[in-house]
A protein has these predicted regions:
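HDAC/HDAC-like amidohydrolase catalytic core signature
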Residues: 1-154, 159-176
């Protein structure tokens, strides 16, 4: 059975007129359930990601600024979201969802995170609506625990996952396509 990471926290209220389509995180599971593509048994709610798992990928200074909501106005503009405790919690849950999906995929072949794919986050900064790079964090999680020998990240976004590519450029066991 395919497992899909989803949490109500994936939807985060944004200012009126904000261009990010946050509503999709509610609509996707609703539609999949409505059409019978999945059942509630397919969905699981991740917990928050552990700090140490994040720090294998992100700089401690950036992480501390992020979780303490001390990003500068310029850093917030690059990310595209206003700082809030709920947004940080959302990112921690999304990231753990991707780790959980990677573990489930190793055992069962496939898993999905409805809100994963935050590929524009770099070690020392976020950008493009990405605060933490969940894919790089999950890859480092698997490698650190010797759960994978090689990892392929398939990124089909028109903008390319620049953060993931940069974070993994010196890691020969990870290839970003």
């Amino acid at each position: 059975m395919i497992k899909i990471a989803f949490s109500p926290i994936y939807y985060h209220e944004l200012p009126v007129g904000h261009r990010f389509p946050m509503l999709k995180y509610e609509l996707i599971p609703e539609q999949l359930l409505h059409e019978g593509t999945i059942s509630l048994d397919n969905l699981f709610v991740p917990k928050k990601c552990d700090k140490m798992d994040i720090l294998r990928t992100h700089d401690v200074a950036y992480y501390e600024k992020l979780v303490n909501r001390q990003l500068s106005p310029s850093e917030q503009r690059k990310i595209g979201f206003p700082q809030s405790p709920e947004l940080i919690e959302r990112e921690l849950v999304i990231t753990q969802g991707t780790i959980d999906c990677a573990l489930f995929a190793l055992e069962h072949g496939c898993a999905l995170n409805i809100a994963g794919g935050t590929h524009h986050a770099f070690a020392e900064r976020g950008e493009g609506f990405c605060l933490l790079n969940d894919m790089a964090i999950a890859a480092n999680y698997l490698l650190h625990r010797n759960l994978a020998k090689k990892i392929l990240v398939i990124d089909l976004d028109v903008h390319q996952g620049n953060g993931t590519a940069k974070l993994m450029e010196k890691e020969s066991r990870v290839f970003t396509f």
